[in-house]
């Protein structure tokens, strides 16, 4: 006789506040998990980049070298390097251990909104209000980009790299997907200025948020709209969106002090997580666990799917 299949467990959503970190670096413009989720990066309006332990909420290192507020950052897969970008028009490559600037790259004509390593951390990609994405070789000493992508009609607000693909979101209302290996470009017209883009974890879809207070899920290869998610407020700020670690839910920051969770398939609002009374500007989802980082004003919140003492007892 056949045993009935076990029912799949309902996905766990981070909704229990584990800790709040007072970052003491002005407004936190972006918060990011590192590649393995053990550390977090905060980008401050006071020109600093900070590295923290997620489990303890303790400050490990401060990186100083930008001339104006830091807007985005990323960590290399082996945790040896960081990259960051700033309103000072520069991109900086950092040595994690020493805290020293390895390279400071100039070339953008305006503030740099977003930066990310490729998978091997051999290339940094930066997107700017000047409408270009610049690709920088992290291993060479040359100060010029190895490639400039200038198809956007307005500023680049967000970019994500996955293997040989690059996804960009622009104020011109378009999501662009570059196949860097094949030299191909696919453009999806959304219409409203894009604030954030990302790939789904399975690589089949793209997610974008825009200033019409809507998050959209598109089929990556066809551009077909698979889902629209709304209810949050995104009218004046560059806010983050993302998918959970298992692609079951769509998340977005909101200007009303909440993080919104929608069921990816149903499109229905699953959870409206109260963070505080101000704008939730940035979020980051753990690569493998149901954990979430949010930033509001000068603080970062770490959220888990269950109360922290219960999680510690299990581990």
UniProtKB/Swiss-Prot annotation:
WD repeats: 23-62, 65-104, 107-146, 151-188, 189-228, 233-272, 275-313
SUPFAM superfamilies (alphabetical): WD40 repeat-like
Localization (cell): Cytoplasm
This protein's UniProt keywords: Cytoplasm, Repeat, WD repeat
Gene Ontology biological process terms in this record: mRNA splicing, via spliceosome
Gene3D superfamilies reported for this sequence: YVTN repeat-like/Quinoprotein amine dehydrogenase
Any one Pfam family match given in the protein's UniProt record, by short name: WD40
Alphabetical list of SMART domains matching this protein: WD40
InterPro entries: G-protein_beta_WD-40_rep, WD40/YVTN_repeat-like_dom_sf, WD40_repeat_CS, WD40_repeat_dom_sf, WD40_rpt, WD_repeat_MORG1
GO annotations of cellular component type: catalytic step 2 spliceosome; cytoplasm
Signal peptide: none
Disulfide cysteine pairs (residue numbers): none
Family listed: Belongs to the WD repeat MORG1 family.
Record protein name field: WD repeat domain-containing protein 83
Origin organism lineage: Eukaryota, Metazoa, Chordata, Craniata, Vertebrata
């Amino acid at each position: 006789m056949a045993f009935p299949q076990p029912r799949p467990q309902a996905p766990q959503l981070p909704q229990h506040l584990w800790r709040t970190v007072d970052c003491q670096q002005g407004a936190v413009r972006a918060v990011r998990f590192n590649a393995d989720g053990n550390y977090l990066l905060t980008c401050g309006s006071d020109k600093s980049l900070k590295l923290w332990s997620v489990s303890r909420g303790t400050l490990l290192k401060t990186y100083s070298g930008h001339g104006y507020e830091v807007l985005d950052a990323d960590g290399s897969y082996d945790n040896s390097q960081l990259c960051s970008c700033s309103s000072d028009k520069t991109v900086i490559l950092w040595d994690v251990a020493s805290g020293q600037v390895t390279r400071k790259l100039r070339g953008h004509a305006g503030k740099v909104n977003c930066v990310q390593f490729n998978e091997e951390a051999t290339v940094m990609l930066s997107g700017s209000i000047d409408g270009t994405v610049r690709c920088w070789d992290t291993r060479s000493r040359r100060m010029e980009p190895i490639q400039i992508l200038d198809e956007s009609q307005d500023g680049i607000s967000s970019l994500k790299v996955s293997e040989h693909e690059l996804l960009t979101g622009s104020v011109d209302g378009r999501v662009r997907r570059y196949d860097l290996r094949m030299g191909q470009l696919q453009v999806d017209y959304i219409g409203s200025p894009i604030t954030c883009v990302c790939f789904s974890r399975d690589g089949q879809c793209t997610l974008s948020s825009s200033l019409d207070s809507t998050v959209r899920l598109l089929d990556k290869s066809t551009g077909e709209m698979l889902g629209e998610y709304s209810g949050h407020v995104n009218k004046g700020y560059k806010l983050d969106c993302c998918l959970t670690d298992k692609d079951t839910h769509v998340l977005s920051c909101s200007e009303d002090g909440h993080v919104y969770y929608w069921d990816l398939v149903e499109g229905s609002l699953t959870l409206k997580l109260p963070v505080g009374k101000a704008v939730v500007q940035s979020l980051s989802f753990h690569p493998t666990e149901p954990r979430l980082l949010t930033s509001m004003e000068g603080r970062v919140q770490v959220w888990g799917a269950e109360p922290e003492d219960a999680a510690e007892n299990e581990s």
